[in-house]
Regions:
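Glycine/small-residue-rich loop that forms an oxyanion/phosphate-binding "nest" at active or ligand-binding sites
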Residues: 64-91
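Boundary-proximal intrinsically disordered activation/regulatory segments immediately upstream
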Residues: 1-54, 136-137
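Alpha-helix capping/helix-boundary segments
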Residues: 34-36, 55-56, 73-74, 136-137, ...
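Short acidic-hydrophobic, aromatic-tinged amphipathic segments that line or gate anion-handling sites
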Residues: 2-4, 67-70, 155-163
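Active-site/ligand-binding-proximal alpha/beta "capping" segment
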Residues: 174-225
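Amphipathic alpha-helical repeat scaffolds
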Residues: 32, 110-118, 226-232
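RNA substrate-binding interface of SAM-dependent RNA methyltransferases
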Residues: 41, 89-180
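Structured adenosyl-cofactor binding patch, chiefly the S-adenosyl-L-methionine
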Residues: 88, 121-125, 136-153, 207-248
Length: 248
């Protein structure tokens, strides 16, 4: 039978809610049966598992040390208001960024839910990497990992200064409601690496980044709509490019 989680250990795990502590230790606590099951299916196993008394351990995690805790302890170590009956301790996702053929550059995407969703749809639609401005949400935070359903562990990412957007041979395209090129008419380059810039819904692509874009793509919408959620816009663009790659 698993041991009970000690009070001292609960305090140590609760400290990982702070970004500084996560970075210092290279660890984070993730919760939820769906996320932990998906990570296990992807071959990503935790260092420890924490279960409410009466909950059964996952067969896929049979080799992982397990501990029993009460609801109060689970509430302390998890960053959600109503955590489910299972949590686990993971190493932070580490990017093995080497290059890309097609990538997103995220310009000020500060909402963790949007950022996680963009990682997830990047896996679905063949986006090789996600590059981030300095003011984006932390890709290694539990909220981002949870909303990505673990995709942050699979899609390479890196922080990137806008100055690097003008690398030789790199095609950079932005997105804007007032863009000069309709998305459906855009032909992606056959061989050159391409970077697709997604700005925040509130502010769009910043002027510093926009001036480095060769063209601005426009997602055509019904009258009366001014903008889309950043993750929704990213999904529409990524899906269009994915379909184009299948038919070209």
């Amino acid at each position: 039978m698993p041991d009970f989680l000690s009070k001292n250990r609960v305090s140590e795990l609760a400290a990982l809610k702070q970004k500084k502590q996560r970075r210092a230790q290279g660890l984070c606590v993730l919760e939820g049966l769906r996320l932990i099951t998906q990570l296990a299916a992807d071959g990503i196993l935790p260092k420890e598992v924490y279960l409410l008394d009466g909950e059964e351990a996952l067969p896929a995690l049979a080799s992982v040390p397990a501990f029993i805790c009460d609801q109060r302890a689970l509430d302390r170590i998890c960053d959600t208001e109503h955590p489910q009956g299972i949590a686990a301790l993971y190493e932070l996702p580490r990017s093995d960024f080497k290059g890309f053929r097609r990538a997103f550059y995220l310009d000020g995407i500060s909402d963790p839910g949007n950022l996680g969703t963009i990682f997830r749809l990047s896996m679905a639609f063949g986006i090789d990497a996600v590059l981030l401005s300095e003011d984006c949400a932390d890709p290694a935070s539990p909220k981002v990992i949870r909303s990505s359903l673990g995709a942050v562990y699979k899609v390479p990412y890196a922080q990137m200064n806008p100055i690097a957007l003008k690398l030789p041979g790199l095609k950079v395209v932005g997105t804007s409601a007032e863009g000069d090129t309709a998305l459906h008419a855009f032909q992606p380059p056959a061989r050159a690496p391409m970077l697709i810039v997604i700005g925040s819904e509130a502010h769009g692509v910043t002027p510093e980044v926009a001036k480095r874009c060769e063209t601005m793509l426009r997602i055509e919408m019904a009258p009366g709509m001014e903008s889309l959620n950043a993750a929704v816009a990213a999904g529409i663009v990524a899906h269009h490019l994915w379909v184009e790659s299948l038919t070209s």
